[in-house]
Amino acid sequence: MFKNSFQSGFLSILYSIGSKPLQIWDKQIKNGHIKRITDQDIQSSVLEIMGTNVSTNFITAPADPKETLGIKLPFLVMIIKNLKKYFTFEVQVLDDKNVRRRFRASNYQSTTRVKPFICTMPMRLDEGWNQIQFNLSDFTRRAYGTNYIETLRVQIHANCRIRRIYFSDRLYSEEELPPEFKLFLPIQKQG
């Protein structure tokens, strides 16, 4: 999808405020919902993915299973709200051995397991809104001893609220981020 586009800085694949936040995504819903709502903490539109079973409620990009994202930027950053329920996400990458590898992070797992084609790992979320930063290059090297080439697919499962998902060429400090990539909490009125 993005293979032939110039990639530097930031590349956003989901922005909850945009006119069509799920334009490149496919939805799977069973005993749950995927909808845009207003989050009270940030007073803004977010995408909520909820379901009784994390494996049957998710969004995946690209929507076409035969396509790949082709994103070469090595950092995946997600602005996600912890809903104090089971939550998992998965990223499929291509390495320099031309092997497709998957990384799955979950808040209900306690150990990291590396198998030839999938690495599952625990993820700890703070209360409220979180910025998850995932160094795909480093994970690929540490788990498989190979080099990251590109991201093929991203899948976000229940249960969470999403503000934005983007890739970047490096980690940026809060001061360096463009305003639309920051999570602004509303100023509390003193009364």
Swiss-Prot record:
Subcellular location(s) of the protein: Cytoplasm, Cytoskeleton, Cilium basal body; Cell projection, Cilium; Cytoplasm, Cytoskeleton, Cilium axoneme
Protein keywords: Cell projection, Cilium, Cytoplasm, Cytoskeleton, Microtubule
GO cellular component, one term: microtubule
Cytoplasm is among the record's keywords: yes
Statement: the UniProt record of this protein carries the keyword Protease: no
Pfam hit, one: CFA20_dom
Domain of life: Eukaryota
Record GO biological process: cilium assembly; positive regulation of cell motility; regulation of cilium beat frequency involved in ciliary motility
Signal peptide interval: none
Function (record text): Cilium- and flagellum-specific protein required for axonemal structure organization and motility. Microtubule inner protein (MIP) part of the dynein-decorated doublet microtubules (DMTs) in cilia axoneme, which is required for motile cilia beating. May also play a role in cortical organization of basal body.
Family according to the record: Belongs to the CFAP20 family.
Name used for this protein in its record: Cilia- and flagella-associated protein 20
Organism: Paramecium tetraurelia
UniProt gene name: CFAP20
